[in-house]
């Protein structure tokens, strides 16, 4: 179970903690802090662990678009996660965005709570559904000699995304 709490020994504000249930002892084990890759001196709240063990949560301790923003951290092993990544617009807004969940079997369709007003919200906490489109872009590159401005033939350009995908 991953949860948010303001326990002693944290990084400040509310941190994300993990605890496991011991079936033999019929009790929860002592919680462990998820560490500095996740927690900040602000508040980390509303954790959600997806089917592929990606951790989603909201925080006001990272640089974001405003208020609480939704972040994700990819699993790096047994109950550990990499650095938090801001999900940006359109998931995040200048207002509070939190409580993200995805539909079963999907990493594109889900629901989020937000106090945004740009989508007809009332400025209070409203529930929105979303369907993230595949990212598509076009890139034109001209590689030339700096001094002669002549095109250099046979150049290969490799574009690498933050998820290490290449094009």
Could you say what each language-model-derived stretch is?
Residues 1-142, 146-149, 156-159, 165:
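Short, conserved micro-motifs composed of acidic
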């Amino acid at each position: 179970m991953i949860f948010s709490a303001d326990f002693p020994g944290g990084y400040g504000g509310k941190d994300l903690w993990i605890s496991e249930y011991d079936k033999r002892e019929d009790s929860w084990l002592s919680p462990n802090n998820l560490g500095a890759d996740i927690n900040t001196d602000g508040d980390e709240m509303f954790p959600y662990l997806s089917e592929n063990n990606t951790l989603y949560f909201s925080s006001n301790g990272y640089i974001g678009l405003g208020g609480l923003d939704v972040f994700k951290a990819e699993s790096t092993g047994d109950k550990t996660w990499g650095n938090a990544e801001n999900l940006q617009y359109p998931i995040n807004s200048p207002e509070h965005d939190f409580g993200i969940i995805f539909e079963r079997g999907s990493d594109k369709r889900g629901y989020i709570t937000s106090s945004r007003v740009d989508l007809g919200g009332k400025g209070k906490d409203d529930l929105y559904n979303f369907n993230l489109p595949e990212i598509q872009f076009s890139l034109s590159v001209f590689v030339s000699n700096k001094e002669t401005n002549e095109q250099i033939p046979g150049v290969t350009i490799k574009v690498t995304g933050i998820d290490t995908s290449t094009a």
